[in-house]
């Protein structure tokens, strides 16, 4: 992919935004090196990595990546035999801690069944060096200071050093407390000069304390003197400091030597953690943009649903559907320069670069984007001042280069194709360039304001027209892309809105040839019809989305129901077993007493009778109920066909197959609802054999046979109950096992009255409100005895 195209489409701005989501310089560096891949499998892998990262962010909110540092330079120094300072050692220890935390974090997710094939494998590459990590933790802190716990010798030296310093300060403080201190000292403070404790003495009293003068004030009136009484203590302090420094150097050298044995492992851990940081940055970036993982096409198919330009304000940007590669491979966006056409080009181009870089894209679920080997763009004024080329020449130079490198795995974006020269010649060139691009097998999206190109989408089977909608009422573009509708001139309408005389507009219209006027009218009609169709489509899509959510909720509830059912059965079984065990124990005791009585000759009870009684008691003990549903013997798999009766296992509902979507999915009619169901969730139901009909002889009034439902909506309360009474008799005579009584929702008075009546009817076995597909609580289902 050319860097020039990345610059034109502003991919560098996307990377800059992405760096804000990295937790380390390693993640930032990986982002700076990010470039679109052209190999389909590589793109699939990077998209899956990002999707797994997004899954982790959804489940856990964040990952334990904080504290990661670039330590490659430190490892290089160890490699050549150098020693590290305390801060460098701490940073390596921090990376080892992050490695351990990340591995544990990933293992926890994998243990609870979260599917993370790529990131799980990446986590497996991390090596936990717990002992090395702990050695560093007790040796240095986050500032790089070597801790007392690093060695016993260092702890002893520092303890002695602190006591010595306390003695020095105690002695000097006694001078400060002396009654003559205010007279002899410039200030009642202890300070340090040349790394030795001193007090500020007035010039005239320098001989009073003896000792060594280490410094004086600018005026010379104050001398900073180390009194003779603390010289030896300060000397001892300096000696201890030298020992401390020597011990610290020994400790750092020892730790550096131990780390040198793990250079390769630490290097690899750091690299893997950098990958994790990069992947989580992509995931968090996608979440912030409300982006999705797109389906990928290796056949040049693009179907973006509600795609948004990622660099524009999400609250204001207009989302557009963009599709290409199935019914047509070339889109020509025509119409005046009212804004929106170039944004469409950049949106498609930039989302392609993002997807091929493993980034999620700002669009709706189920969007598809193609993986291209090349993305070419001729957008904006690329005039070269050095070469003194005109705008037209600059564009043409770029187009010549594009046509020389394009192939059938290419996406070409032409902005204002043929502009900058005579309109007639420019339009002719544009048509020829589009034909040449198609001949190379490329996918093309081009914008132009030449009306001559409107016919291109009609005259070429591989092409279609498009335009950006313009609101004449507000005199501004809506930025809504209309694929299949060519752009039209709005000059007359705009002029009228701005107050131009109607006479002038009428005269202007008369000067336009009839064909152009008819074409504009046709385009206007197409726009209206398209807007209507799009509104209906959005409503249908919203309904489908709602149905899908209901299905998921229903499946979840059914799953919870069966889990609860199994739990209750198991509890009941255990309780029953406890009761029987108690009974057995009592029976054993009784049998023992009877046997004792028999031995004593007190009763004529036979031994086999005792054994038989015990056996029957043992058989009475229930076995724990297996909550696994018995499996029917395996039969040859049924090949599903349209019209088959099936059971949807996850819902426990029967349905009919409408049409096959793919090998993995069918459209199924369940009651009044049509749903997409996975093939693995379907079970074939054999057609029922016709049963012999019972002949029921009954005497009733001649008339229409009873229906399976009674509609009471609009009826008065008393009339409704009379109709229910009569209808139940007719339904029973007709042999219906159950019927539906429709009373509507309303205020609930009629529903309550009907329900109370049915509860007391001698032939009613049960009643319930209808399911959602049957009419909800506006319908009562009656089952007869």
Swiss-Prot record:
Organism superkingdom: Bacteria
GO MF assignments: ATP binding; ATP hydrolysis activity; ATP-dependent DNA damage sensor activity; endonuclease activity; mismatched DNA binding; ribosomal large subunit binding; rRNA binding
Pfam families recorded: MSSS (PF20297), MutS_V (PF00488), Smr (PF01713)
SMART domains noted in UniProt: MUTSac, MUTSd, SMR
Keywords in alphabetical order: ATP-binding, DNA-binding, Endonuclease, Hydrolase, Nuclease, Nucleotide-binding, RNA-binding, rRNA-binding
Sequence intervals crossing the membrane: none
Family the entry assigns: Belongs to the DNA mismatch repair MutS family. MutS2 subfamily.
UniProt name for this protein: Endonuclease MutS2
Organism in which the protein naturally occurs: Listeria monocytogenes serotype 4b (strain CLIP80459)
Gene name, Swiss-Prot/TrEMBL: mutS2
């Amino acid at each position: 992919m050319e860097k020039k195209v990345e610059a034109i489409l502003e991919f560098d701005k996307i990377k800059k935004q992405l760096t804000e989501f990295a937790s380390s310089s390693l993640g930032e560096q990986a982002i700076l090196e990010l470039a679109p891949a052209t190999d389909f499998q590589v793109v699939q892998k990077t998209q899956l990595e990002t999707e797994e990262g997004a899954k982790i962010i959804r489940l856990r909110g964040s990952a334990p990546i904080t504290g990661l540092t670039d330590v490659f330079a430190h490892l290089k120094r160890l490699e050549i035999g150098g020693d590290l300072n305390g801060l460098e050692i701490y940073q390596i220890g921090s990376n080892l801690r992050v490695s351990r935390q990340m591995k544990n974090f990933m293992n926890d997710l994998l243990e609870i069944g979260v599917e993370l094939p790529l990131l799980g494998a990446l986590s497996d590459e991390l090596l936990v060096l717990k002992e090395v990590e702990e050695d560093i933790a007790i040796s240095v802190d986050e500032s790089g200071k070597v801790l007392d716990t690093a060695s016993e010798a260092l702890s002893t030296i520092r303890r002695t050093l602190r006591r010595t310093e306390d003695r020095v300060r105690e002695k000097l403080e006694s001078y400060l407390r002396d009654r003559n201190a205010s007279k002899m000292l410039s200030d009642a403070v202890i300070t340090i000069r040349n790394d030795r404790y001193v007090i500020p003495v007035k010039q005239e009293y320098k001989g009073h304390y003896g000792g060594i003068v280490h410094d004086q004030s600018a005026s010379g009136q104050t001398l900073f003197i180390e009194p003779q009484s603390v010289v030896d203590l300060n000397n001892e302090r300096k000696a201890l400091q030298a020992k401390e420094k020597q011990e610290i150097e020994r400790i750092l050298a020892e730790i550096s030597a131990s780390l040198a044995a793990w250079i390769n492992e630490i290097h690899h851990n750091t690299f893997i953690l950098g990958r994790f940081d990069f992947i989580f940055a992509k995931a968090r970036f996608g979440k912030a943009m409300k982006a999705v993982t797109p389906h990928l096409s290796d056949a040049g198919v693009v179907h973006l649903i509600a795609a948004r330009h990622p660099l524009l304000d999400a609250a204001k940007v207009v989302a557009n559907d963009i599709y290409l590669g199935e019914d047509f491979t070339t889109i020509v966006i025509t119409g005046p320069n009212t804004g929106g056409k170039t944004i469409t080009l950049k949106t498609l181009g930039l989302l392609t670069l993002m997807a091929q870089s493993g980034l999620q894209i700002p669009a709706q679920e189920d969007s598809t984007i193609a993986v291209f080997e090349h993305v070419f763009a001729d957008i904006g004024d690329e005039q070269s001042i050095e070469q003194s080329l005109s705008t037209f020449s600059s564009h043409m130079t770029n187009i010549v280069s594009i046509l020389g490198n394009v192939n059938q795995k290419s996406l070409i974006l032409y902005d204002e194709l043929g502009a900058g020269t005579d309109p007639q010649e420019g339009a002719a060139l544009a048509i020829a360039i589009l034909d040449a691009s198609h001949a190379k097998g490329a996918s093309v999206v081009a914008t132009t304001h030449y009306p001559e190109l409107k016919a291109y989408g009609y005259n070429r089977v591989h092409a279609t027209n498009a335009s950006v909608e313009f609101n004449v009422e507000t005199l501004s573009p809506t930025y809504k892309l209309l694929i299949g509708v060519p752009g039209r001139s709005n000059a007359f309408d705009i002029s009228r809105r701005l107050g131009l005389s109607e006479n002038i507009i009428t005269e202007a219209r008369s000067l336009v040839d009839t064909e152009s006027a008819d074409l504009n009218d046709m385009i206007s009609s197409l726009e209206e019809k398209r807007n209507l169709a799009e509104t209906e489509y959005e409503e249908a899509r919203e309904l489908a989305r709602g149905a899908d959510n209901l299905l998921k909720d229903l499946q979840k509830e059914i799953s919870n129901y069966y889990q609860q059912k199994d739990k209750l059965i198991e509890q009941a079984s255990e309780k029953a077993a406890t009761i029987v065990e108690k009974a057995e124990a009592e029976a054993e005791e009784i049998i023992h007493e009877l046997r004792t009585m028999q031995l004593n000759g007190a009763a004529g009870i036979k031994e086999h009778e005792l054994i038989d009684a015990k056996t029957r008691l043992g058989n009475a003990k229930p076995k724990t109920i297996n909550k696994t549903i018995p499996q029917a013997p395996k039969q040859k798999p049924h090949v599903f066909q349209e019209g088959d009766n099936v059971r949807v296992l996850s819902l426990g509902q029967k349905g009919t197959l409408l049409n096959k979507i793919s090998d993995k999915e069918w459209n199924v009619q369940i009651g009044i609802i049509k749903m997409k169901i996975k093939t693995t969730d379907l079970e074939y139901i054999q057609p029922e054999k016709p049963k012999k009909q019972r002949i029921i002889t009954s005497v009733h009034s001649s008339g229409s046979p009873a229906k399976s439902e009674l509609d009471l909506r609009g009826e008065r309360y008393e009339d409704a109950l009379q109709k229910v009474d009569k209808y139940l008799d007719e339904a029973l005579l007709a042999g219906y096992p159950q019927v539906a009584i429709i009373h509507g929702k309303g205020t609930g008075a009629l529903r309550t009255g009907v329900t109370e009546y049915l509860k007391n009817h001698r032939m009613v076995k049960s009643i319930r409100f209808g399911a959602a597909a049957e009419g909800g609580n506006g319908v009562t289902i009656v089952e007869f005895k």
